[in-house]
């Protein structure tokens, strides 16, 4: 039906007769001439109808936005004065000789000026996806997956599928359960990741595996989370953690070079402890130059409990954040930041405004200055590198609250004051995570997942001091987003059972949930390691959007609903009966 795409016509096509198929993006009726912008997935071209082709001109008068049409015409060069430098096809236009209206469009439920609520965009997603910027994002996503496949093939990885209907295993979120009609009362689980299957593939001798795969997690959603998402899943045998990172870093550098024309360079490597100490985050945005500075040792003897308490507590921390030029902040802005850190558990926000450092106490403005002598204040200014016109904010509490609150404040202030260089790319690896973290109920939970190997520890040493264990794990972070994470896996049965035991999984439960894995570990398991990238998040970064729903063709809302198809929906009672399922309604609160 077509000979060319609208968006691919150039000066080289001048004089050629072409047939185009697409949609009316815009129509302008000048009486004797009618112009339309005609759109397809490759872009937009200007088509015009003149009186010499009366039948086509008459039919063109009926055109409206989003009519689906076919046009045959001749490509012509535009006059110099009519060239549109903002369009890829702006040097040419098509003189139409014939027009076919394939399908008409009703009055559109979306505003052609693109001022639409996200709810409307999701409900009429098939119309939203016609917008050039949305089409371009999905084309970029397709390019990314193509580049990934070629890279992985070139590096000896095998694309192997793993099951969608599998067994529920604890991986940190709730499973989506699928009832079995054949096995009454039993359920499959949709995979949160192919974790165990890819490890089993290494035990099967496939050495290098990858898969671009759907995963499912029934968890509370955030702006960058979806109940179903896509991973670039990778596993290798006989490779160390640095070797895995080297190959995966090469993949990501390849993507940025091909998609953005940007060489990311070598990725710095930072430990979890250093990231938390300097940036208050295990996924630091290195485009932001500000860092946290520990000052607890300077404040242990002050008669100000807000500082002295955490400063003398082994589990406490007092950290300072120097904000270049921050002395210009108003009282209202400072109060807003004080309220902001309370979201993260902080009780408030102390500060020092540095107006003229050389004047000592007279050169600063601070509500806490009365609790600090000139010597302590000068030591704080010296350590933080404060200059005239700067602001210093303080966080004082337990280590987690200080890291969370001051880390978030660092990001917010950096954005608000334009200190974060948003023209840059700042990738890094974060390594050496704690193996376990407190579950809040006196027990431990795996910081990554229970199949991650500890670093330089025997099973006996791990059992004796699990709180000291460092995971042989690594995350890739770009511009403050965790885009991928992985680890060296446990390849020894004793170690795996030790980890299960530390997590409170008794032997009976181990056999019930992981018997197949424990059995497989008995038969010459190779050392193996892997990683998974979030394809949605990678695409989000590479297309410059901050909304993950913009890079998924048919995403869910934050309530895990599809507004277009109205999923989820109630099941047919007959289907439920066949599955031996009865829906029990919760009693309404009186």
Curated annotation (Swiss-Prot):
Top-level taxon of the source organism: Bacteria
An annotated GO BP: aspartyl-tRNA aminoacylation
GO molecular function: aspartate-tRNA ligase activity; ATP binding; nucleic acid binding
Region feature (Aspartate): 195-198
InterPro entries: Aa-tRNA-synt_II (IPR004364), aa-tRNA-synth_II (IPR006195), aa-tRNA-synth_II/BPL/LPL (IPR045864), Asp-tRNA-ligase_1 (IPR004524), Asp-tRNA-ligase_1_N (IPR047089), Asp/Asn-tRNA-synth_IIb (IPR002312), AspRS_core (IPR047090), GAD-like_sf (IPR004115)
Record-listed L-aspartate binding positions: 171, 217, 448, 489
Subcellular location: Cytoplasm
Entry keyword DNA-binding: no
Enzyme Commission number(s) from the entry: 6.1.1.12
Catalytic activity: tRNA(Asp) + L-aspartate + ATP = L-aspartyl-tRNA(Asp) + AMP + diphosphate
One GO cellular component term: cytoplasm
CDD domains registered for this protein in UniProt: AspRS_core, EcAspRS_like_N
Annotated binding of ATP, by residue: 217-219, 226, 482, 534-537
General function of this protein: Catalyzes the attachment of L-aspartate to tRNA(Asp) in a two-step reaction: L-aspartate is first activated by ATP to form Asp-AMP and then transferred to the acceptor end of tRNA(Asp).
Family statement drawn from the similarity comment of this UniProt entry: Belongs to the class-II aminoacyl-tRNA synthetase family. Type 1 subfamily.
Subunit structure: Homodimer.
Name the UniProt record assigns to this protein: Aspartate--tRNA ligase
Species per Swiss-Prot/TrEMBL record: Escherichia coli O1:K1 / APEC
């Amino acid at each position: 039906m077509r000979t060319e795409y609208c968006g691919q016509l150039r000066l080289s096509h001048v004089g050629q007769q072409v047939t185009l198929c697409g949609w009316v993006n815009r129509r302008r009726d000048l009486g004797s001439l009618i112009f339309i912008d005609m759109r397809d997935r490759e872009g937009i071209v200007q088509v015009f109808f003149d009186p010499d082709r009366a039948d086509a001109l008459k039919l063109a008068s009926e055109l409206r936005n989003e009519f689906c049409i076919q046009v045959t015409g001749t490509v012509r060069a535009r006059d110099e004065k009519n060239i549109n430098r903002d369009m890829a096809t702006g040097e040419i236009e098509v003189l139409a000789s014939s027009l076919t209206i394939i399908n008409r469009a009703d009055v559109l439920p979306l505003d052609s000026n693109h001022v639409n609520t996200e709810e409307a965009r999701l409900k009429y997603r098939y119309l939203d996806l016609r917008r050039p910027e949305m089409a371009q994002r999905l084309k970029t996503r397709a390019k990314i997956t193509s580049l990934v496949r070629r890279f992985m093939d070139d590096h000896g990885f095998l694309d192997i599928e793993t099951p969608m209907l599998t067994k529920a295993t604890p991986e940190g979120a709730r499973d989506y359960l699928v009832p079995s009609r054949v096995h009454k009362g039993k359920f499959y689980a949709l995979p949160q990741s192919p974790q165990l299957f890819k490890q089993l593939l290494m035990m099967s001798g496939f050495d290098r595996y990858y898969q671009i795969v759907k995963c499912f997690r029934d968890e509370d959603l955030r702006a960058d989370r979806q109940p179903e998402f896509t991973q670039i899943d990778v596993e290798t045998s006989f490779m160390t953690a640095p070797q895995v990172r080297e190959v995966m870093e090469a993949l990501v550098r390849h993507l940025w070079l091909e998609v953005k024309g940007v060489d990311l360079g070598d990725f710095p490597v930072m430990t979890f402890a250093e990231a938390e100490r300097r940036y208050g985050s295990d996924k630091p945005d290195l485009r932001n130059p500000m860092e946290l500075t520990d000052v607890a040792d300077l404040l242990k003897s002050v008669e100000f409990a807000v500082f002295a308490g955490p400063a003398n507590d082994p589990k406490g921390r007092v950290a300072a954040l120097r904000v270049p030029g921050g002395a210009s902040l108003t009282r209202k802005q400072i109060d807003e930041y004080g309220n902001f850190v309370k979201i993260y558990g902080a009780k408030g926000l102390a500060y020092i405004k540095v107006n003229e450092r050389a004047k000592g106490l007279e050169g600063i403005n601070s509500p806490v200055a009365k609790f600090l002598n000139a010597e302590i204040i000068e030591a704080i200014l010296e350590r933080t590198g404060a200059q005239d016109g700067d602001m210093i904010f303080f966080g004082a509490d337990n280590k987690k609250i200080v890291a969370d609150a001051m880390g978030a404040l660092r990001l917010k202030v950096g954005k608000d004051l334009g200190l974060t260089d948003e023209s840059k790319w700042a990738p890094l690896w974060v390594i050496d995570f704690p193996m376990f973290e407190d579950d809040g109920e006196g027990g431990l939970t795996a910081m990554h997942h229970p199949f991650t190997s500890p670093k330089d520890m025997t099973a006996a040493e791990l059992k004796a001091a699990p709180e000291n264990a460092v995971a042989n794990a690594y995350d890739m972070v770009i511009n403050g987003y965790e885009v991928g994470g992985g680890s060296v896996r446990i390849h020894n049965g004793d170690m795996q059972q030790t980890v299960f035991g530390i997590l409170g999984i008794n032997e009976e439960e181990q056999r019930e949930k992981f018997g197949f894995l424990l059995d497989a570990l008995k038969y010459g398991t190779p050392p193996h390691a892997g990683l998974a990238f979030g394809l949605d998040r990678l695409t989000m970064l590479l297309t410059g959007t901050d909304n993950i729903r913009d890079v998924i063709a048919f995403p869910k809302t934050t309530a895990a609903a599809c507004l277009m198809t109205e999923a989820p929906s109630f099941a047919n009672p007959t289907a439920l009966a066949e599955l031996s399922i009865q829906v029990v309604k919760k009693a309404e609160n009186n």
